[in-house]
Amino acid sequence: MLRLLQIEYIKLWNNRASKFLIISYFVLLSLIALISMIKINFGAINFSLAEQGFFNFPYIWHLNTYLAAWFKLFLAIVIVSMMSNEYSNKTLKQNLIDGLSKKEFILSKFYTVLSFSIASTIFIFLVSLILGLIYSDYTQPSIIFSNLDFLFAYFLKLVGFFSFCLFLGVLVKRSAFALGFLILWQIFEGIYFLIFFYKISPAFYEITSKFLPLNSMSNLIKEPWSRLSAIKTAANQIGANANFDYHTHWYEYVIVMAWITIFICGSYVILKKRDL
């Protein structure tokens, strides 16, 4: 495993674009901390995100994993480019000539996906922990380390999304077309929502949409805003229901794990049958 990872990181670190995107990704993740500095002073209105409970434990685990997931496209570009470069630079063929099997080749890419996901999860854990210890009103260990399941959901969401990008990179060969296909698939799931939710049956959509790849990954971390006490108070005043189930159910984990298996095995099958 370490040998395969070393091969991939040598390739990535010698690619200036990949290096820039990886560094930019972690810089953007660290900028989440700057949210704590946002203060609005407008006449008699004094508003601070930190004072509104944004960084209270255990809510911060939910909020930061939700926000950080939006930046995953940076690493997605790296992963798609990583695969397309293997074809354009003919390093894939050279690796196979040098004795690397096709199975080991796909595993090296999957290990890279796992390492990116693990590093990102650890980074978000540390950033959230520091922000929480500084701003949270609750510092009891039992509260601090509750709701850590959001970190696992975040990790699995990244692995699923990056595995999808890897599959598209193997399938399409060109990074621009692979990213274009990713955007088209997102549009398809949006159209699926509009047709089935509004035109056919909301109940049918709720059942079937759980199995769509991007939607299933999105379901791992629901929106966190309605958990804020200010939002709940406002909702109760207008008679709206603000009590939602924010946690991930076991079957939602299983669905994403199934897609990860499909994407990685599919990548291997395509590579095995393709004439290089």
Regions from the language model: what does each represent?
Residues M1-F26:
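Aromatic- and glycine-rich beta-strand/loop motifs that create alpha-glucan
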Residues R16-K19, K103, A176:
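Residues that define the loop-to-transmembrane-helix transition and helix capping
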Residues L21-F26, A178-E189, E206-F211:
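Central hydrophobic cores of alpha-helical transmembrane segments
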Residues S24-M82, L107-K173, F197-I200, L212, ...:
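Secretory targeting signals
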Residues A33, S117, G190-I191, I264:
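Hydrophobic transmembrane alpha-helices of multi-pass small-molecule transporters
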Residues I77-K103, F110:
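Transmembrane helix boundary and interhelical loop/hinge segments in multi-pass membrane proteins
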Residues V254-L276:
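Junction motif at the cytosolic side of a transmembrane helix
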